[in-house]
């Protein structure tokens, strides 16, 4: 099912926006003056009308304005900047004109597939330039010429330094999941990429969460940006039920998980752990207990990660155990349950994790395992998102069915 066709319009209409004065709402894609072949691709992809974020952000980005767009997961953020990039590039010029940086390889690959689908009638070239893949293939594709490159900061910086990714025609830089990108791990690599870009490059920052320090940092490479910010109270996903299970000791979590599985019939579920070692340990324990599970984390070779994601997307595997590498923007429609085996160590990641369930307004349930030491973290998450996380009721099976 296409990304756009499942957006929860009621929740979308209720969103509160804090926007710059010049932002107007465009209720239809036709009113945005988009290219004919791009419109065809948008409708073929499953969109009928723009979501709240799309109706505000696309025209501003197409005008060339630096833009900060914040909206929760599942509101069509990826299509917002993909449509904008496709509108501003000139496909007659076989040079890179738009660059997207993402924090994970999976997200960069997903963005590439969205761009290719929306640009289906435009003869667009778009390449996923990511670590863990064959460098020779990157070089071949980039030397051939790509209109849009979607990549991870390390590999993109490397290709620019080697002069295979030519930057002189780049008009737009998109930072997707900017909160994660601008965290310490990627900050230097982004500056590395940014200094190779033409001085007039437009910058678009997109994320579900934008902490104040990130907004502060954007002043370094954005000029008078248009701001389209969802008010924080709206950021916990509507339609998602959130619960906790009090688990006295860490050692008891596994038995709690097994009990939970005995009572639930689940389409698909994701279980989050905070470390790669814990993912491997839990996967082994679940398999020993005769549960069919797959697992994924950043230490795995890219080919293996791709194959696990494909199996999960196609429904061949029903339970995926992962670290936060999976939590950023990966869209699997059937996910009905997210279990935080460990509460996220960074409260910003909470919304990214639970946003995997009930995408585009589909109902979903998030269950948090909370030890005595975790109570403070849970309260912090509740305060930060102005939400309430209740103890799990006995009839939770009815809520997920």
Swiss-Prot record:
Superkingdom, natural source: Eukaryota
Ranges in coiled-coil conformation: none
Cellular-component GO terms for this entry: nucleolus
UniProt xrefs under SUPFAM superfamilies: P-loop containing nucleoside triphosphate hydrolases
Annotated ATP binding sites: 71-78
Family, per entry: Belongs to the DEAD box helicase family. DDX48/FAL1 subfamily.
Entries under InterPro entries matching the protein: DEAD/DEAH_box_helicase_dom, Helicase_ATP-bd, Helicase_C-like, P-loop_NTPase, RNA-helicase_DEAD-box_CS, RNA_helicase_DEAD_Q_motif
Name of the encoding gene: FAL1
Ranges where the Helicase ATP-binding domain occurs: 58-228
Entry's Gene Ontology molecular function annotations: ATP binding; ATP hydrolysis activity; RNA binding; RNA helicase activity
Keywords: ATP-binding, Helicase, Hydrolase, Nucleotide-binding, Nucleus, Ribosome biogenesis, RNA-binding, rRNA processing
Subcellular localization: Nucleus, Nucleolus
Domain called Helicase C-terminal: residue spans: 239-400
GO biological process: one example: rRNA processing
Protein's UniProt keywords contain rRNA processing: yes
DEAD box (motif): residue ranges: 176-179
PANTHER family on file: ATP-DEPENDENT RNA HELICASE DBP3
Protein name (Swiss-Prot/TrEMBL): ATP-dependent RNA helicase FAL1
Gene source species: Gibberella zeae (strain ATCC MYA-4620 / CBS 123657 / FGSC 9075 / NRRL 31084 / PH-1) (Wheat head blight fungus)
PROSITE patterns: DEAD_ATP_HELICASE, HELICASE_ATP_BIND_1, HELICASE_CTER, Q_MOTIF
EC number(s) recorded for this UniProt protein: 3.6.4.13
């Amino acid at each position: 099912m296409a990304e756009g066709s499942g957006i929860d319009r009621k929740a979308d209409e209720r969103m509160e926006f804090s926007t710059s004065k010049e932002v107007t709402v465009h209720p239809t894609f036709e009113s945005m003056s988009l290219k004919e072949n791009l419109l065809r691709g948008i409708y073929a992809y499953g969109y009928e009308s723009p979501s709240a974020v799309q109706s505000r952000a696309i025209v501003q980005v197409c005008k060339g304005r630096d833009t900060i767009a914040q909206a929760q997961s599942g509101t069509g953020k990826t299509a917002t900047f993909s449509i904008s990039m496709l509108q501003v590039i000139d496909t007659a010029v076989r040079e890179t004109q738009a660059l997207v940086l993402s924090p994970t390889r999976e997200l960069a690959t997903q963005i590439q597939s969205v761009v290719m689908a929306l640009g289906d009638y435009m003869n667009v070239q778009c390449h996923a330039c990511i670590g863990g893949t064959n460098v020779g293939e990157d070089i071949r594709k980039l030397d051939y010429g790509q209109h849009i490159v979607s990549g991870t900061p390390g590999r993109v910086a490397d290709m620019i330094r080697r002069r295979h990714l030519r930057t002189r025609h780049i008009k737009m830089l998109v930072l997707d999941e900017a909160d994660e990108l601008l965290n310490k791990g990627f900050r230097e690599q982004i500056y590395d990429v940014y200094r190779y870009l033409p001085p007039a490059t437009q910058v678009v920052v997109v994320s579900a969460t934008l902490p104040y320090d990130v907004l502060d940092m954007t002043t370094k490479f954005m000029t008078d940006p248009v701001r389209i910010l969802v008010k924080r109270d709206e950021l916990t996903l509507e339609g998602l039920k959130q619960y906790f299970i009090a688990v006295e000791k860490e050692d008891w979590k596994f038995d709690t998980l097994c009990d939970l599985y005995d009572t639930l019939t689940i389409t698909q579920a994701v279980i989050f752990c905070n470390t790669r070692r814990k993912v491997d340990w839990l996967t082994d324990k679940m398999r020993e207990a005769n549960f069919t599970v797959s697992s994924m984390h950043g230490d795995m070779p890219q080919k293996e990660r791709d194959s696990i994601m494909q199996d999960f997307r196609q429904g061949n595997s029903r339970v995926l155990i992962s670290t936060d590498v999976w939590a950023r923007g990966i869209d699997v429609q059937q996910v009905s349950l997210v279990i935080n085996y460990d509460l996220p160590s960074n409260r910003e990641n909470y919304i990214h994790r639970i946003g995997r369930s009930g995408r585009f307004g589909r109902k979903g349930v998030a269950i948090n395992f909370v030890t005595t030491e975790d109570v403070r973290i849970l309260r912090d998450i509740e305060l930060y998102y102005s939400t309430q996380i209740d103890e799990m009721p006995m009839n939770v099976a009815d809520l997920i069915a």
